[in-house]
Amino acid sequence: MDELINLLIMDQVTLYEHVKSIDNPNYIKSIVPNGGILFIPLDEERYPLLCTHLDTINDFNDRPAPSIVDILIDGDTLSLNPYSSCSCLGGDDRCGVYTALKLINSNVPYAFGFFLDEEIGGVGSDKIGISSVMPYENITAFIGLDRRGKDQVALYGYDSVNLINVFEQEGYKTVYGTFTDASNLAKYWDIACINLSVGYYNEHTTSE
């Protein structure tokens, strides 16, 4: 819980610097200015790319990130203090960033993307999507960690029945999404993408 709270109180610039400072010998780190950061697993020929974004609606609305006093803790649930000046708590997408960082720390042999400015149209994933650092030939799927709820697998028209079945067999429910970095990247090479629930609710509101 403390690690997630530490991510929630960072603005996009601070979080970008935090992720950029991470060094793990099991990954190649690539930094694309104004795009984001990729971690590519060493000695792996095929892997999914798990996608997260570093901004929140607070950045979009020019509001500050929450401070410690802005965050209410009730058991395993975090929410925004109703007296806060923030636009949202920021679980979208700090929950996804938290999950990705945990997986990197566990040396899971997937690729990970941390993208800038998703909330204003996927600016960061567009820049990385057309850059030379994106190893499209090795990527099996784009998997977003950027969906509300706890049991949704969102589709965007770049579908793989086999990939969807993996999550439906685990109890996930298929829904249709509108936009996320994973779908933004899928358009470049027509690679399958999905977006998975990461545990936030009421995104983009003070009730998050």
Outline where the language-model segments fall.
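Active-site metal-coordination/substrate-binding segment of hydrolases
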Residues: 31, 42-109
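Short glycine-aspartate micro-motif
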Residues: 47-51, 140-144, 193-195
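Zn-dependent metallopeptidase/amidohydrolase metal-coordination segment
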Residues: 173-208
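A non-catalytic alpha/beta surface segment that caps or lines the substrate-entry region
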Residues: 2-45
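Hydrophobic anchor at the start of a short beta-strand
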Residues: 25-30, 47-48, 110, 172, ...
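Short, acidic Gly/Pro/Ser/Thr-rich loop/turn segments
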Residues: 57-59, 120, 150-152, 201-203
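Short amphipathic alpha-helices and their capping/turn segments at secondary-structure boundaries
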Residues: 36-43, 49, 129-134
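Acidic/histidine-rich catalytic neighborhood of metal-dependent amide-processing enzymes
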Residues: 85-167, 174-175, 182
